UniProtKB/Swiss-Prot annotation:
Composition bias type Acidic residues, residue spans: 613-625
Disordered as annotated region, ranges: 1-202, 580-724
Name of protein: mRNA export factor ICP27 homolog
Biased composition (Basic residues): 72-85
Job of this protein: Immediate early (EI) protein that plays many roles during productive infection including regulation of host cell cycle progression, regulation of viral gene expression or nuclear export of intronless viral RNAs. Acts as a transcriptional transactivator via interaction with the cellular transcription elongation factor SUPT6H. In addition, acts as a post-transcriptional transactivator that mediates the nuclear export of unspliced mRNAs via interaction with DDX39B, a component of the cellular mRNA export machinery.
Biased amino acid composition, Polar residues: 179-202, 691-702
Family: Belongs to the HHV-1 ICP27 protein family.
Record text on subunit structure and interactions: Self-associates and forms a tetramer. Interacts with host DDX39A and DDX39B; these interactions are required for UL69 function in mRNA export. Interacts with host SUPT6H. Interacts with host EIF4A1 and PABPC1. Interacts with host PRMT6.
One term of GO molecular function: zinc ion binding
Organism per entry: Human cytomegalovirus (strain AD169)
Location relative to the cell: Virion tegument; Virion; Host nucleus; Host cytoplasm
Domain of life of the organism encoding this protein: Viruses
Gene Ontology annotations of biological process type: regulation of DNA-templated transcription; symbiont-mediated perturbation of host cell cycle G1/S transition checkpoint
Amino acid sequence: MELHSRGRHDAPSLSSLSERERRARRARRFCLDYEPVPRKFRRERSPTSPSTRNGAAASEHHLAEDTVGAASHHHRPCVPARRPRYSKDDDTEGDPDHYPPPLPPSSRHALGGTGGHIIMGTAGFRGGHRASSSFKRRVAASASVPLNPHYGKSYDNDDGEPHHHGGDSTHLRRRVPSCPTTFGSSHPSSANNHHGSSAGPQQQQMLALIDDELDAMDEDELQQLSRLIEKKKRARLQRGAASSGTSPSSTSPVYDLQRYTAESLRLAPYPADLKVPTAFPQDHQPRGRILLSHDELMHTDYLLHIRQQFDWLEEPLLRKLVVEKIFAVYNAPNLHTLLAIIDETLSYMKYHHLHGLPVNPHDPYLETVGGMRQLLFNKLNNLDLGCILDHQDGWGDHCSTLKRLVKKPGQMSAWLRDDVCDLQKRPPETFSQPMHRAMAYVCSFSRVAVSLRRRALQVTGTPQFFDQFDTNNAMGTYRCGAVSDLILGALQCHECQNEMCELRIQRALAPYRFMIAYCPFDEQSLLDLTVFAGTTTTTASNHATAGGQQRGGDQIHPTDEQYANMESRTDPATLTAYDKKDREGSHRHPSPMIAAAPPAQPPSQPQQHYSEGELEEDEDSDDASSQDLVRATDRHGDTVVYKTTAVPPSPPAPLAGVRSHRGELNLMTPSPSHGGSPPQVPHKQPIIPVQSANGNHSTTATQQQQPPPPPPPPPVPQEDDSVVMRCQTPDYEDMLCYSDDMDD
C-alpha cells in the first residue's frame, strides 16, 4: 500500500503517459500489489488478505517490516512466485497447482458457468494468483456462506499465528506454505494449531449430525445400515488377507485357503482341552471336549483346521467322506443326535459367512445340508404336532405353516406362483413360533447351499461366498446351537394333559429301541448259502434229521457230494423267473442255490414240495402241478429224493420224477399217474431215494463212483460275491436314489 501511495503522490498523471506506459503501470499495480520491500530483498511469504483501504494500511506496514527482518536473517534467494497448494485435513497431500479451491454453491451461481476459474491471472506475472484469491474472498464474503472447514484460517507470518480479518468469519481463509521450497505442506505449529482449533468442534458437529440421523432411522433402516457396515468390514478383512497372505498356486482351485491364515483372519488358537479337529471324527481317537460355545467356534481357528483338511484331501477320499457323512446324517438314532448334527453343519457355514471364506462346493457339510429340513420334519412328525403347536387334536394353522416351510415350492401357473417360496424367504426372526423359526433357519441355509453349489458348477473359475446368496440375512442372525435351543426349549416348555403326547416326546428324545419279535423269510425264494460257507455237512444233516423227527413226515438229507458241488456254474438261458429275479437283486452273482426246507406241519397235512422244473412253467401250471404233486404223494407214498450233479448220465430209475433242466441241487417228488410219464432228460443222473414216507424202512440206490468234476472257472470281477458287491460304495448321485432295480 505504501508503494501505491507513493506512486500516486510522486508519479505524473495518467493523462500525460502514453498508452504503453499506462498498460505497464496497470500491470504493475495488479502484479506487484502488497509488496512494500524492494525487489532485491523480496522473498516468498504468505500473502495477506485484502483489508479495508482506510484502516489496515498501518498494521500491514508493521507486519511487512517484521517479515523483511525475518527475511534478512535467513538470506533466502529470490525465487519466482508460484500458486500455493491447498492442503487437506490430513496435511498429507496438496491439491495440484492448477486447481483452485472450490467455491460455495452460492458463489458459483453468482459467477456463472465459469465457476471458480473466472480469474486465473497471467502466467507471466508473478503474484497473479493473489488477485484471483482476493476476488474469490470478496465473493465468498458477499455470499455469507462458510466454506469447507479446512479453509478456516490464514497464516500470514512464519510463526504460524492466525490473522483475523476484522472479526468477519465469512471470509474465505486458506492456508499457504511459509516457504517456497515446501509447497504442499504447512508449518508444524500451523498444523497443530489448525487441528486443535477447528478439527475438534467440526468432529463434534459431525458426530452430532450422525447421532441425529440414527435417531431418525427406523428399525429396518438401522438393520440395513448394520448389514452394510458388516459387509464393509468383511471386504476390508479380505483385502488385508489378500495383501498379507501368499499368492495361491496356479494349479490350486479357486476356493483354496492358501492365502487365508489365522493371523490374517485375526483368529485366536483354539483351547488345548478341545478334541483335536479332524475331518474323520472317530471314537477311537483321543477324547476331548466337544461342547464349544459360539465365541469359541467363531473366533478361534478350530473350524479353520477342519476346512483346511477338506481342501487337502484327494477327490476319491473326499467323496468317500461325503458318503460316510450322508449315512451318519440320514441314520440319526433320535432327535437329539439329529439336532446336534444340524447345528454342527449350520455353525460351519456361519463360520465361512462371518470371515468371508470362499466355499468348497464339494464340502461334506455342504453336501448334506440339503436334506436336513426333510429329516428334521420327519423326526418332528413323530410327535403330536397338533397338541404342541396348535393345542388341539389334529393339524392346525401352525402345523400347516411348518409343513409349508419344508415342502418344495412349485409354480401353480404362469401368472400365479405358490406362496411357499415367499414364506421360505422370510427372515427367521420374523417367526414367533420356536419350531417355525428353527425350521426357517434350516430351510434358509439349505437354499443358500443349493444356490451356491449350482452357481459354482456354472461358473468354475470364480470363488463363491455365502454373503452373495444370503438374501434374508439368516446367516447373519444365526447363533451356534440356535436350532437345538429353539426345538428342545419348545418341547420342554410344552404342558398338556395328554399322556400319549408326553410319551411321544420322551420316545423322540431317547434312542430308539430294537423291537422285533421274529424274522420271517419266504420258503419259496432261493437263499444264498455263501453266508453259511463255514457250516459243515454233519451239522446240516443233524439239523435236518432233528427237524424230520419233530415233524414226523418227510425229511431232507443233503449229502457231502451235494455240498462239494455247490460251486457249479449254470446256463443263464435256463434260469427261471424266480432265479432271474434273485440274480437281478444280487448283481447277477451265480451263487449256488438250494430250495428252502418247508416249515413244520402236522402229519395229517401233506407238505408241498416244489422243484425247479415246476418253477419254469407259468403260474397256472405251477399251481396245478403243485396240487398234483400233493395228490401223487398221498396216493403212492413214495420218497422224497435229492438229485446230484456228480453222477454221469445213466438209465433212469423205476421211480420217475420231474427233473429240472439245471444241474443244481433240487427237491424232487414223483410225477402224477394220470398225467403220463414226463419227458426225460437223457444227460441227468438217476434219482436217489433218501427215506420212505412212513419212516419204517429206507432204500438206498447204488450210485456209480466217478472221478470228481473239474474245478469251476474263477469268477470274473464283475461277478464277485454279492455281499462284497453290496459293500462297495456307489457314487453320491446314484446313492441318493439307490435301489436294487438300478443295478443293471
